[in-house]
Amino acid sequence: MCPARSRMKTMPHRTLLQITTANGGWIPPLAIGVVCLIFYLFVFAPNLREQKRTQALIKNIKKGDPVVTIGGIHGVVSVVREHSLVIKVNEHGTLEVSRSAIARINDRRGVSNPKTDCDSKPGVPLTGVDKEIAR
């Protein structure tokens, strides 16, 4: 019989388990914790910040704000209700949409409007592309 095998037979099971698990130490749990922290910082935290910003934006919508819905419909808020908004999309058409359907407010986000940008800079000649956008 092999001498190592005879020693294993004489060792109590508890000692054998302690020998095999004692080599792991604290490094693997620490590594898992670091990976979880990095995952939280790069995935969950930015998403939570974006949700808070969007909720604040939707909460502060007022009459006259130019908005864009998640479906891409552009309009101006004409009536503000508790859970919905009525937006005017043209001279004759209005839509009632849920507050959660608003993707952005054009004024507050700094989205430029080519027509007003061109009008606000007198003396600057329009290029061919600018003329197409300004129409």
Curated annotation (Swiss-Prot):
Q: What keywords appear on the UniProt entry?
A: Cell inner membrane, Cell membrane, Membrane, Protein transport, Translocation, Transmembrane, Transmembrane helix, Transport
Example GO CC term: the record gives: plasma membrane
Protein localization: Cell inner membrane
**Keyword set includes Transport:** yes
* Residue spans crossing the bilayer: 25-45
Tell me how this protein sits in the membrane: Single-pass membrane protein
Q: Which GO terms fall under biological process for this protein?
A: protein transport
Q: Name one Pfam family in it.
A: YajC
- SMART domains referenced in this protein's UniProt entry, alphabetically: YajC
Annotated region described as Disordered, given as residue ranges: 108-135
What is the top-level taxon of the source organism? Bacteria
- Biased composition annotated in UniProt, kind: Basic and acidic residues: 108-120
**Role played:** The SecYEG-SecDF-YajC-YidC holo-translocon (HTL) protein secretase/insertase is a supercomplex required for protein secretion, insertion of proteins into membranes, and assembly of membrane protein complexes. While the SecYEG complex is essential for assembly of a number of proteins and complexes, the SecDF-YajC-YidC subcomplex facilitates these functions.
Which family, according to the similarity comment? Belongs to the YajC family.
Summarize the subunit comment. Answer: Part of the SecDF-YidC-YajC translocase complex. The SecDF-YidC-YajC translocase forms a supercomplex with SecYEG, called the holo-translocon (HTL).
UniProt protein name: Sec translocon accessory complex subunit YajC
Which source organism?
Treponema pallidum (strain Nichols)
What are the leading ranks of the lineage? Answer: Bacteria, Pseudomonadati, Spirochaetota, Spirochaetia, Spirochaetales
